């Protein structure tokens, strides 16, 4: 609870599942643009003091180049390996194989931190913006109002989940 967990993934089902799972365990979810290089990853993972990163094996080349400068990063979960590789390189499949089919969400208070977004850095160093659980409710509500969505609609947001629009409307909405 309260740990910062980032995902560095393209539009895969695991991106959506992990984001919602992070919220479910009352951790703070962050997403990283899927084309980021080492410097952008280091800026955001280092500044946030992220404890865990969910990514793919093909991204490990970038991560390994900066890992020694991320002392708070304790775990990396890979979505495309069948078994844990070490105590700190874990398999998404192995971690989720016994997950419950029930979607039981614990009660949270509106002021509980939920999502950490970073600005693009167009005016300087990227800045972290912490959203609260009340904002998750508002994003869900506004996406229905703005996009005129109903329970019968299927919506696909083309924005990368590494940016606020992709998360707010592509995952939460």
Per-segment meaning from a language model:
Residues 1-36, 160:
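Conserved AMP-binding/adenylate-forming
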Residues 20-25, 47, 163, 172:
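Short hydrophobic alpha-helices that are characteristic scaffold elements of the AMP-binding
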Residues 78, 96-118, 125, 148-154:
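Conserved pre-ATP/AMP-binding loop-to-beta segment of ANL
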């Amino acid at each position: 609870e309260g740990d910062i967990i980032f995902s560095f993934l393209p539009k895969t089902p695991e991106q959506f599942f992990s984001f919602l799972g992070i919220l479910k365990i009352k951790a703070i979810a962050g997403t990283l643009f899927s084309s980021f290089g080492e410097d952008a990853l280091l800026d955001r993972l280092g500044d946030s003091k992220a404890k865990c990163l969910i990514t793919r094996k093909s991204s490990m080349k970038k991560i390994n180049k900066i890992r020694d400068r991320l002392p708070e990063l304790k775990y990396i979960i890979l979505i495309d390996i069948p078994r844990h590789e070490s105590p700190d390189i874990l398999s998404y499949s192995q971690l989720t194989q016994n997950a419950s089919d029930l979607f039981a969400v614990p009660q949270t208070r509106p002021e509980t931190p939920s999502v950490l977004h970073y600005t693009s850095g167009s005016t300087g160093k990227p800045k972290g913006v912490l959203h609260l659980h009340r904002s998750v409710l508002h994003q869900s509500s506004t996406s229905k109002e703005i996009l005129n969505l109903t329970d019968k609609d299927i919506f696909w947001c083309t924005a990368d989940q590494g940016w606020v629009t992709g998360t707010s409307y592509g995952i939460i909405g």
